[in-house]
From Swiss-Prot:
Gene designation per UniProt: ligI
Record function comment: Contributes to the degradation of lignin at the level of the protocatechuate 4,5-cleavage pathway. Catalyzes the hydrolysis of 2-pyrone-4,6-dicarboxylate (PDC) to (4E)-oxalomesaconate (OMA). The keto form of OMA can tautomerize into the enol form, 4-carboxy-2-hydroxymuconate (CHM), under certain pH conditions. Also catalyzes the reverse reaction. Is essential for the growth of Sphingobium sp. SYK-6 on vanillate but is not responsible for the growth of this strain on syringate.
Family: Belongs to the metallo-dependent hydrolases superfamily. PDC hydrolase family.
Thermal activity profile: Optimum temperature is 50 degrees Celsius.
pH-activity dependence text: Optimum pH for hydrolysis of PDC is 8.5 and optimum pH for synthesis of PDC is between 6.0 to 7.5.
Enzyme class per UniProt: hydrolase
Listed pathway(s): Secondary metabolite metabolism; lignin degradation
Binding locations of substrate: H29, C30, H31, Y47, S75, R122, R128, Y154, H178, N251
Effect of D246A: Loss of catalytic activity
Protein name: 2-pyrone-4,6-dicarboxylate hydrolase
Keywords for the protein's UniProt record, in alphabetical order: Aromatic hydrocarbons catabolism, Hydrolase
Molecular function terms from GO: 2-pyrone-4,6-dicarboxylate lactonase activity
Amino acid sequence: MTNDERILSWNETPSKPRYTPPPGAIDAHCHVFGPMAQFPFSPKAKYLPRDAGPDMLFALRDHLGFARNVIVQASCHGTDNAATLDAIARAQGKARGIAVVDPAIDEAELAALHEGGMRGIRFNFLKRLVDDAPKDKFLEVAGRLPAGWHVVIYFEADILEELRPFMDAIPVPIVIDHMGRPDVRQGPDGADMKAFRRLLDSREDIWFKATCPDRLDPAGPPWDDFARSVAPLVADYADRVIWGTDWPHPNMQDAIPDDGLVVDMIPRIAPTPELQHKMLVTNPMRLYWSEEM
């Protein structure tokens, strides 16, 4: 399959945001795809995207006004983290990463990932993206992570309560992708947001990403339901929120977002300079570049 025959899920000419991020701002949730000729996709991949390599990611970073990236291993690459490690290496200190690993990984392999810039592992519970999510094996590997690492968990709101005992048992900090995908049409006091707040209140070391208006708000831009539902959460948990573009927007080929508009959501969910600095600089620095704090 040629590159042009694969899925295009990102805007190739994103607008320039009206909002200017603060100096040192971090895009703390993005991915790279391939290039496939160098980094083949997993045989188990549920989608086959076009190449979206580090040069494209870093050009977007600069275009949007960010200083650093946290690159999350994309599910299409399975547990082979080579593409993500390559992108981190090319960033010359301006990127860190989140790996996806076989739970049987040994300590030497984890140490090598740490040396390569990884600072956590991701557990994915979206059945359309992964075939197996063994909680017992996930807990075992979570107990062997290098010092300072955390676990990123991706799930949808309808299984939050089912996952609570599993998350309670994780022995390291947790970061929740996309707030556990709440139905933002319910508003800030809806059942999904209330359940997510209960989760955040259960542990002081659970963080979240206030991300993906394009995924969570089916009405489309300007994503008013997302802004209305998420702004109170950011205000109430300002020390535990981070943000990212989600570029190159896996599986969003039917509703490709404009990254400039995605960035312009920031002041709507974090309306003060103080909140913006926490979400974009202080908090992700604590998680990913703590040695510089």
